[in-house]
Amino acid sequence: MASLALSWSSTATGLPSQPLFSIKPPHSSTYTTRTRRCTWSCKANNGGQNEKHSPQNVETSQGKLDRRNLLLGMGGLYGAAANLVSDRSPALATPITSPDLSKCSTGTNLNTQQPLDVNCCPPVSKEIIDYKLPPVGKMRFRPAAHLAGEDYYAKFEKAVELMKALPPEDPRNFMQQANVHCAYCNLTYQQTGDPKLKLQIHNCWHFFPWHRWYLYFFERILGKLIDDPTFGLPFWNWDNPDGMIMPEVFARKHSPLFDARRNTSHLPPALADLAYSSKSPTNPKKIIPNNLTVMYGEMVRNVSKLEDFYGAKYVVGTAPDPGPGSVERGSHMALHGWVGENTPTGEDMGNFYSTARDPIFYSHHTNVDRLWTVWRGLRGPKPKDFPDSDWLDADFLFYDENAQLVRVKVVDTLDNEKMGYVYQDVDLPWLKNRPLARVKKSKAASSSGAPAAETVFPVKLNKVVKVLVKRPKKSRSKKDKEKEEELLVIEGIEVDTAKFVKFDVFVNDEDDKPDELDKAEYAGCYSQVPHKNSTKVKTKIRLG
């Protein structure tokens, strides 16, 4: 059962229009359902990156309604809203710094109050070296997985086989490498500087840089094991119809790239579903256009501001999961759930503690990393990185290819070529795939009969819910649009981290077909794969 509560404040003026927002019933699923509480807080800003909600401009009363229209649901959520973002990080911020590995814990299952049955803590080393990127000689080349040949895969398989054969206590061993993700992503570390809070690198602005470092060292370990300093990981090119099928080599049962804990219905020749849920379509004629619409939204439509793409600010004193970026909450999460077993906990790929045990994790995330590089290229003269030292100076710990514990910083991840690797050039079929509106907005709103949002929320999402929320201003000029972007921010999404969560968001839709995403009315989604550590978190998403 899902529940939502809304809260608004507004500083904008003008005659409102009334877009329609409707909430559709939850998808039936083998995943356990959960309760979620969402607070919608919206405020127009002036295009700045550091907009904050001060006590005087955040209204927590259920009765105060910001001037915008909204439609929300477990199976579909519709919204049109003015721009605004909440920044709940401490006023005097300190960047996230390396955890104390000696204080790694196995964590506690908050449902049972019993210790977790998985220990993903790494070996502890007394010596930590500040890592410096080595001079780049010949670039490592990362090929598209569906285009790589048998000679390449023979080399890749040999490297993974050797990694799995390393002594269990060696930090370069395959399971030790998998546990790196488990430890950083399942609340086993304390925040250095605020031991009351746990460290989590997902659902925040560290998602891309942390995973880039993770892949960087994993790749270098493989290269050293086969004595090939130019070896590069393959990327699963799931954003292109030609690469949407799981690369066949990963499905060979006797390959070191195989993992038994996968959804057997999604092995080749099934097409990857970038908006995966239990009600997802199986017809390729629907999956492919849906996927291209998802990618356009994540890479073009919903990423005008840096936070939209990277995720929310996360510093010492910030509670975990302040908010994911567009790719992280969308296609990235969808593929984790799509590959993992069809069980409530979704191992291996579909659960954060076990996901990196599946070798396809690394090809999946190599494509995510590639999309970061692509997005930066699409930005042109626009800012590509936060100038904030709280982001640039954040640091993490990894073991390198020599089993040396090293400290690395976000600032060194901003150029993949300086890190010594490049990607194979492939087409971007989603780039020109801007979806068209199916209905006139005025028609959708006027014919809906939906009540005002303040009369409906809070609500349990066990049925279709449609509400109208007034926008702050209509008929904005081009100059107005350049000055203020219109966004829907859903914040205060409260979830249990141990369970699968997904809802879609639509604006002014009228046909109640949540499996049809190739239309402008589809605004995006929120998605979460389970964690081993069960806890309640609050997060947010931003939709354009």
Regions found by a protein language model. Name each.
Residues 2-544:
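C-terminal accessory segments of proteins
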